Amino acid sequence: MCQILLAILAIFLPPIAVLLDVGCNCDLLINILLTCLGIIPGIIHAWYIILCKEKTVVQNIYVQTNDHGTAPPAYSPYSA
C-alpha cells in the first residue's frame, strides 16, 4: 500500500496502519501498547515502521530431489 496513505492513516489509527504495512507481528503489538500509553507515541512508532524500517523479503525455496540411484547396503549384524 502507498506509504503516504499509511502515514496519513497512522495519524488517526496507528495500529491499523502498522497492521496493513507489516501484518500481525511484534511491531503491531508494540504499537498497540504505545497507543494505549498515548496517541503520540503510537503515531511516532507507526511512522517509524511505515517510513524508516526496512521491509524483510520472504523468499520460499523449494528443493526437489530425484534419488533414483542404487540403495545403500543393508545393515547386517553378521559379517558375510
From Swiss-Prot:
It is found in: Membrane. The chain crosses the membrane at residues 4-24, 32-52. The keyword Signal does not apply. It is a multi-pass membrane protein. PROSITE patterns: UPF0057. Pfam families: Pmp3. It comes from the Eukaryota. The keyword Ribonucleoprotein does not apply. Keywords: Membrane, Transmembrane, Transmembrane helix. GO terms for cellular component: membrane. Belongs to the UPF0057 (PMP3) family. This is UPF0057 membrane protein ZK632.10. It comes from Caenorhabditis elegans.
